[in-house]
Amino acid sequence: DSDSVDLLQRQPKRPGSTVSWWHLIQSSSDSAATAASWFVSPSLGDDADRQGLIEGLRNGVIDAVAVHALPLDDEECLLPPDQRQRGVAGHQHVLPALWQALVVTRGWSAEELWDILSFKPATLLGRTPEQLALGSNRWLLFDPEQTWTPSRDDPSASKAANQPWLHRAVKGKVVACGLRTPKSHCG
């Protein structure tokens, strides 16, 4: 939450830190935040907390975005909340959601978004950030204008029961990537 960002900012030597993508696009006041099929930890804050996290990420107090995907099946989602794992699934939602929330709504550049999604997480983990090179399979093609509807029936989609926005139109989609075989797609 925004108090945590303030605490990090006051540290003379800041520890590495990440924020979940879901905390950047949802708040406790959003209807999607009350879905019965998933819960996140820490819980979502209010809109001021979300704004504080976004500002902390943009000004470097928070280093990177974390996905922390945790797919649950239908049975697991039937358990009472205190008896199941906390988390939200849906890698395919991350780039479209953050594109809309940060690039479209808040004016971030594509480079700033990619930095917090790829380069800074690699650096935080002590890995060499990826570079686009001829012959590399480390690439993706994202269409920010393509609208699609996530469904568990899609052969390339997650089968997790705890993913947000099932059967709801989403704008922006990864349409191809080098890490997939020719038989599968990325969306």
Where are the language model's segments positioned?
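Histidine/acidic residue-rich metal-binding segments in metalloenzymes
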Residues: D1-V65
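Short, glycine/acidic-enriched loop or turn micro-motifs at the edges of active sites
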Residues: W21, P71, Q146
